[in-house]
């Protein structure tokens, strides 16, 4: 019987499970949707009960899909960095003013806590050095402060505040252990010192969490992949269709699991892994850009971190990101007048809207006699529709489009789609430049996630950044990264680095363009930067008007 591990990944819209053998070969996967409520603009809520139900169904379905039922020795969980609120009995506590306890999760992308974030950032606290100088409203301490101020009844009822990955391991094991990954990256826990910053929490208005001995936010903190307690409980095993006692690894945030799935893959050009030259790009609803340093911590304005041991023990992690990438591309395409017709045509042909758009771009390039990328010479997009996470770290920024025509045909949609994808790629270039300015020498991007299944997205990122882009052999790299956690917890590998070496492998690579096309992207990148400067100038003009 094949020994196997399970990776569970809870993204923004679905819960997925993957079964892998200990060489990283995928045996089966399954996915189940999860529900989301959006009661106000820039708010997003979910249900932890709904999420756990979807996780259990996905694991059961994946196990049933295996050609031969394997011997599962470990399971790892990753999820979005959403905030879960429970009472002392483990029941959901509402995060919504309407009072529905089923809605007890503030989703990672929710920006309701902007006022709290601005107040915290104005304090200039020392801990902010370890989040790029400024907190994001997507982090947990502003959300906790919002909950305390706006829903005091929920605050009083709450006994547990979990990051979603840690909620999953709690459901699996009954242990309230928190992951070093989640606490360091999203909760301002100082991983390099192994402590909470009491003065910071007290100063911003969360001193009661300190007085309670951190009972509600985590006093048992574990390294990623470390085994939790006695493994799967009898009840969790019954729900998941597995055997009690299976090893459960301490969890990770979903993007960081993707980093585990790609950043350490062996490359033929080098016998060793030079992390200073590698960036892991995890492209989905949003995008995350992970780099690690063996040297002293690198403080990069507008880039989260440096986070100690948040992905690999002993290494410092810096994390750039874009709050909306796949979500932005979907928004632009789905809001166009031709979207309904294109969706119907895709259904009729048995393909996707994006494949049809890519086909249209190929036709347009053929007519023009030039490469696809040059079709957007007069059309430019600033992609900050949901603010800018990195490197400007300003959630108040907004997007822009320059070069629109009085047209709503398929060609118009295809060009707007291409310009948006390119804008996302220029955002990645901006982040890479900020990282390289502080000591990194990034020339290779290891990419995974839903966006990396699109060849237009991949080519745009290679050409815009000038980096070689490497894809993993296993396309479900986030699931594989989570499975590595389960393998390490089960003792199949001594540590995460060994698990990465044994289970992750490189696939094909894409080299960046040079010559005329490189100069074209340099020019468009200059426009990208100027679009932001222009937005700031417009704001100043309006502010002067009173």
Can you describe what each PLM-predicted range is?
Residues 103, 182-189:
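Glycine-rich phosphate-binding loop of ATP-grasp-fold ATP-dependent ligases
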Residues 63-141:
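Active-site phosphate-binding/coordination module
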Residues 17-19, 24, 75, 110, ...:
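Conserved small-residue
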Residues 6-7, 118-132, 145-177, 186-203, ...:
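Active-site core segments that coordinate phosphate-bearing ligands/cofactors
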Residues 1-95, 157, 238-250, 408, ...:
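N-terminal glycine/serine-rich phosphate-binding loop of ATP-dependent small-molecule kinases
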């Amino acid at each position: 019987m094949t020994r196997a591990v399970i990776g569970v990944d809870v993204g923004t819209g679905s819960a997925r499970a993957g079964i892998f053998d200990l060489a990283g070969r995928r045996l089966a996967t399954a996915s189940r949707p999860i529900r989301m409520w959006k009661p106000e603009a820039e708010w997003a809520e979910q249900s932890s009960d709904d999420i756990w139900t979807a996780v259990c169904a996905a694991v059961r379905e994946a196990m049933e899909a295996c050609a031969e039922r394997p011997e599962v020795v470990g399971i790892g969980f990753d999820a979005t960095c959403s905030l879960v609120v429970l009472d002392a009995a483990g029941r959901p506590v509402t995060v919504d003013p309407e009072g529905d306890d089923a809605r007890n999760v503030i989703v990672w992308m929710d920006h309701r806590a902007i006022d709290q974030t601005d107040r915290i950032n104005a304090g200039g606290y020392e801990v902010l050095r370890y989040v790029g100088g400024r907190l994001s409203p997507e982090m947990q301490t502003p959300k906790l402060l919002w909950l305390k101020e706006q829903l005091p009844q929920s605050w009083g009822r709450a006994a547990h505040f979990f990051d979603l990955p840690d909620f999953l391991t709690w459901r699996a094991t009954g242990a309230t252990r928190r992951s070093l990954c989640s606490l360091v990256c999203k909760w301002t826990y100082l991983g390099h010192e192994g402590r909470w910053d009491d003065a910071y929490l007290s100063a911003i208005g969360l001193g009661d969490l300190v007085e309670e001995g951190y009972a509600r936010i985590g006093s048992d903190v574990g390294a990623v992949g470390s085994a939790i307690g006695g493994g799967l409980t009898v009840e969790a095993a019954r729900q998941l269709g597995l055997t009690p006692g299976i090893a459960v690894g301490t969890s990770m945030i979903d993007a960081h699991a993707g980093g585990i799935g790609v950043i350490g893959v062996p490359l033929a050009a080098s016998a060793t892994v030079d992390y200073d030259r590698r960036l892991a790009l995890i492209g989905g609803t949003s995008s995350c850009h992970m780099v690690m340093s063996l040297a002293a911590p690198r403080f990069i304005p507008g880039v989260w971190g440096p986070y100690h041991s948040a992905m690999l023990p002993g290494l410092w992690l810096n994390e750039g990101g874009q709050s909306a990438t796949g979500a932005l591309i979907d928004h632009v395409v789905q809001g166009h007048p031709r979207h309904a017709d294109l969706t119907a045509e895709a259904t009729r042909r048995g393909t996707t809207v994006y494949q049809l758009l890519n086909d249209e771009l190929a036709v347009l390039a053929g007519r023009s006699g030039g490469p696809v990328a040059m079709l957007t010479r007069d059309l430019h997009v600033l992609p900050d529709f949901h603010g800018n996470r990195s490197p400007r770290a300003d959630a108040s920024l907004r997007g822009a489009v320059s070069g629109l025509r009085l047209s709503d045909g398929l060609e118009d949609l295809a060009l707007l789609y291409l310009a948006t994808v390119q804008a996302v790629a220029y955002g990645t270039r901006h982040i890479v430049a900020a990282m390289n300015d502080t000591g990194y020498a990034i020339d290779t991007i290891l990419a995974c996630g839903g966006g990396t299944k699109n060849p237009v997205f991949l080519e745009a990122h290679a050409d815009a950044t000038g980096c070689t882009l490497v894809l993993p052999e296993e396309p479900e790299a986030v699931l594989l990264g989570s499975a590595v956690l389960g393998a390490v917890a089960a003792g199949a590998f001594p540590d995460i680095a060994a698990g990465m070496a044994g289970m992750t492998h490189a696939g094909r690579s894409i080299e960046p363009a040079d010559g005329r096309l490189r100069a074209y992207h340099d020019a468009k990148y200059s426009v990208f930067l100027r679009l932001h400067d222009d937005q700031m100038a417009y704001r100043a003009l309006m502010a002067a008007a009173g």
